[in-house]
Amino acid sequence: MSTKILKAGGTEADSFETSISQALVELETNSDLKAQLRELYITKAKEIELHNKKSIIIYVPMPKLKAFQKIQIRLVRELEKKFSGKHVVFIGDRKILPKPSHKTRVANKQKRPRSRTLTSVYDAILEDLVFPAEIVGKRIRVKLDGSQLIKVHLDKNQQTTIEHKVDTFQSVYKKLTGREVTFEFPEPYL
């Protein structure tokens, strides 16, 4: 497999996605990640600019997400070197099924699984974003005007490894879901 990108529906990859794919192929041939990278591929990639800093979002197929997460720390480090310091995040390529209404209920014989609901997908995106850190708590603050602010508590042990990326995580999550989120590293309760 010379290319590392398989898009849904067999559509062609654009130039940016091809460059990401090429970087993964180079990593596979040159580094000690060869064995782990051989079976892996991505479904799409996006580049977004936030506060004059660019970030790269790489979508991976759900069955391969666990395998990507095993090597994610090293893979992110290598890709960030290659793409001159742009922050790289890996996210599982999930599908959201629409909420069944009275009209559509007849057409769908199957019940919508919990993993395909909007809430579940958005929570999972948040977990993928902050990997390798773990979410230890979450507070949702609803303001008087109805807007929500999500406070996510991350594991204090991982503060040194991901603290510099917190702004990227906030802006990527806002771009993908439209939800405001802040990250904190609270002291563990005893």
Curated annotation (Swiss-Prot):
One of its GO terms (molecular function) is structural constituent of ribosome. The keyword Acyltransferase does not apply. Keywords: Ribonucleoprotein, Ribosomal protein. Pfam families: Ribosomal_S7e. PROSITE patterns: RIBOSOMAL_S7E. GO terms for cellular component: 90S preribosome; cytosolic small ribosomal subunit; small-subunit processome. One of its GO terms (biological process) is ribosomal small subunit biogenesis. Belongs to the eukaryotic ribosomal protein eS7 family. This is Small ribosomal subunit protein eS7. It comes from Manduca sexta (Tobacco hawkmoth). The gene is RpS7.
